[in-house]
Amino acid sequence: MVVLGSTGSIGKNALKIAKKFGVEIEALSCGKNIALINEQIQVFKPKKVAVLDPNDLNNLEPLGAEVFVGLEGIDAMIEECASNLVLNAIVGVAGLRASFKSLQRNKKLALANKESLVSAGHLLDISQITPIDSEHFGLWALLQNKTLKPKSLIISASGGAFRDTPLELIAIQNAQNALKHPNWSMGSKITIDSASMVNKLFEILETYWLFGASLKIDALIERSSIVHALVEFEDNSVIAHLASADMKLPISYAINPKLASLNASIKPLDLYALSAIKFEPISMERYTLWRYKDLLLENPKLGVVLNASNEVAMKKFLNQEIAFGGFIQIISQALELYAKKSFKFSTLDEVLELDKEVRDRFKNYR
């Protein structure tokens, strides 16, 4: 298999599962963590390696692997790889081209790059995609019973770092505080997206593309991150998917469903500890961006605007140029600006053109 973004949280766990399942790693790519990819090269001995920045080539130790550089290099690497499975864990819209290239080459796509579906779900062959996400894995598992007819799909949110912060103090919070997730430790982007509830807006759009636009789609807060998804059926019964909060579960099924079903990758649940489970609505007063949920479901191509404005805001927030209130304001202004526009793009280039337009419009925000 090919692992793109092998030095991130998803990539590292994917390599653990691949090793456990005896899956050969043909190719790896990374962003900036050259020291770690050098270690991975020693262990997995890939035939091909890609790095984003040519300035990192001097520190790369490929051990005879063919080396590719930049996003174009990743495309070329995918083109040349014989593997049938590509796991895309690149962060941000930078991973979009890799998703397209993988599907163009008729490869199965294990997709952790949310931005691919959020920005261009209408252009991707969903039948070849397995999402690497606890919530969507939960929905997939719940929908395997074809006798029951689903009515609504519900995914859970932890509430993020500011779920108990006094409302009047949320706007002045900085990135350091946003990165203090109460339940888990992952990358900075997804942790901040959890605090803003953008991550759940992304997952709502992913659910739309993956499981069908005809069903009602919603989310709720479940603080323990044990209930990942629920499905309500036409008979008014509801089934929930519970599991330890560990990404190795969806990763293992994306790599090899048969082996995953026979080999546990996560800890068993302590059922006696489940009495604390409680469901809460997502408050629009606390999570002001949640008010755009219905707008995005009505016009899912707005996902391009959501993602582009979020990446602009994220960079400014992490660079301490703006506080959390400014972060929210950039995304709100972008969605309000484009809310009534009709998008008819049918190519990747058109998606990237709108992405660039949104970034250019908000890059000088202060």
Swiss-Prot record:
Name of the protein: 1-deoxy-D-xylulose 5-phosphate reductoisomerase
Molecular-function GO terms, alphabetical: 1-deoxy-D-xylulose-5-phosphate reductoisomerase activity; manganese ion binding; NADPH binding
GO BP, sorted A to Z: isopentenyl diphosphate biosynthetic process, methylerythritol 4-phosphate pathway involved in terpenoid biosynthetic process
Necessary cofactors: Mg(2+); Mn(2+)
Matches recorded under NCBIfam families: Dxr (TIGR00243)
Binding annotation for 1-deoxy-D-xylulose 5-phosphate: 114, 134-135, 158, 181, 194, 199-200, 203
Main enzyme class: oxidoreductase
SUPFAM superfamilies listed in its UniProt record: 1-deoxy-D-xylulose-5-phosphate reductoisomerase, C-terminal domain (SSF69055), Glyceraldehyde-3-phosphate dehydrogenase-like, C-terminal domain (SSF55347), NAD(P)-binding Rossmann-fold domains (SSF51735)
Pathway entry: Isoprenoid biosynthesis; isopentenyl diphosphate biosynthesis via DXP pathway; isopentenyl diphosphate from 1-deoxy-D-xylulose 5-phosphate: step 1/6
Originating species: Helicobacter pylori (strain G27)
